[in-house]
């Protein structure tokens, strides 16, 4: 019989599991939770402190995609994902471009944004004049929080007022842009915003006799001014395909479709983000924030479309991906998680901008490999071959039967039904 509980967070791990056993778990299934604990207690404690109410660890494969030549540097890129074919596709894309110049990147900008949302009942012109004349004092008021970041080249970049009163009475916003050096900067930005809001409220009230109502202070995960571009380029004749011009034309058209059709664009970008997320997770970055920002960026013109584009002009194939990436190489999980720390070492201890370039290039490699597969062999042929092991495991195939199935399906189409039929005959 399941029941609600008060004070669950105060229970020990053993007590939490006991409560789950009594209320939700079938007999004996709690042992699965224990199987994934680390035998090293200190190591296990690190993991348990990442989140709340922890009762076990959830493992994901940690993989390597080699042969990434990015801005002249060769990388073996760590990727964390449970999805079949993602790492294989990224690796295939990296290998293809390794001998064709690799990936060239540029950081378009690296500004991040936070916002102070407030209501104010005075005249907009008075507020605008107040902001203009007090920007320097606003920045100075936050020095206790920003001084260390400023020594690393970061800090407050701009402060501007946004007026929303035409659509929401008395509602304004202070838009504050930051540079956060090699940190993702979420905690830093939020701390500065709260400190600034206190000073702003007191100063505005003193000068105008009208007190603002601070609604909230929070960073934005939409970072259209923290953007990286990754690009690949080669002659059409350098493609291995027999009918290179025919296939590169199809390729260009496939990417173009993702520019004009939202249904295709969502799946197209999902494939690109497979690579982005996998490297973000491996390096301890917030893939959910990255996902949210990327998809908002894809719809920045009012229509959701592809994050990548492709041209074939004068016998030259060019593909590029442009996306916002607010990532860090210091602070947070990047240093707390042993594998996140190792990932950054594998990537030769990159700066945050270098990590932006790496992640964008993996996303582009992923996207290139997926589209190439779509316009040549079709997505299922490669994906289902790589997914075969998962199907066999799910159906309980023995090691010897699984081995024979792998050989059989080298020359046969893979599907769940086909695998089931094969196993039934054994």
Question: What are these language model-derived features?
Answer:
Residues 100-133, 298-360, 366:
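A structural-propensity feature for long, helix-poor, extended segments
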Residues 189-204, 209-339:
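Glycine-rich anion/phosphate-binding loop at the beta-strand->alpha-helix junction
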Residues 317, 324-426:
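Catalytic-core signal marking the mid-to-C-terminal active-site face
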